[in-house]
A protein has these predicted regions:
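Compositionally biased intrinsically disordered regions enriched in Thr/Gly
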Residues: 1-227
Length: 227
């Protein structure tokens, strides 16, 4: 849909360049994103070593932004199971990287609050695009999890679609258990579904890693009436 490109004429100064600790996001070609991820990854490794926890990314290696990818997913494990998920949707936002409560404009090296992004693109366009994109993402991610889990002792592979559809329906209709640790709302209002939850056997790789893969749903507002 490409509406994220409507802000391409704005300069970083006009958009209000913000800072992350020790990193100025000032590159339009992706190097700033790679530097951000590299620094975050190194800090995560130090934290995991100090805490004695297992680093969830050790097996997969460092994720690097590539302009040819439509979607880039990366995840960091946290000790309480609350995960940060990065999603790069170039075919939705043009070149806006959305994570948690902020968005990174790859064209201008600018870090924006998600509210600023919504103000720029319009809530109706945002909802329409994200609804379409997340439907594909949920399916792709769930299928990938089912494939990874297709091992003796796993149960998700056999019931992946059934579980996915049931959980999405519960969230969309507001019927999910508010105490369910697999579902929570982030600070910017995104409804997240954990697909790793030992009690519900969504995904478990047999190891002892304390990590969760989240699918950001923006549920009721973005997925309902999708078709």
């Amino acid at each position: 849909m490409g509406f994220g490109n409507e802000g391409d004429s704005a300069t970083p100064e006009e958009q209000g360049t913000l800072y992350l600790p020790r990193i100025l996001l000032d590159s339009p070609d992706g190097t700033a994103v790679n530097r951000l991820i590299q620094t975050w990854y190194e800090e995560n490794q130090r934290d995991t070593k100090e805490s004695g926890q297992t680093d969830a990314l050790e097996a997969d290696g460092l994720p690097i932004w590539d302009p040819m990818w439509d979607h880039v997913w990366y995840a960091a494990n946290t000790w309480d199971g609350m995960l940060s998920v990065g999603i790069l949707c170039r075919n939705v936002f043009g070149s806006v990287h959305v994570q948690g409560g902020w968005a990174f404009d790859l064209d201008h090296g600018t870090l924006l609050d998600n509210q600023e992004v919504l103000a720029q693109v319009g809530i109706s366009q945002f909802v329409q695009a994200v609804r379409q994109e997340l439907r594909a993402m949920v399916t792709q991610e769930w299928d990938a999890i089912a494939q990874r889990s297709a091992q003796p002792g796993d149960v998700i592979a056999e019931h992946a679609e059934e579980n996915r559809d049931r959980r999405l329906a519960e969230i969309q209709s507001g019927q999910h258990d508010p105490e369910d640790p697999a579902v929570f709302v982030t600070g910017d209002g995104a409804v997240c579904l954990s697909v790793w939850n030992p009690s519900q056997e969504y995904y478990y790789d047999g190891g002892d890693e304390d990590w969760t893969t989240l699918i950001t749903l923006h549920a009721a507002s973005t997925l309902q009436n999708a078709g």
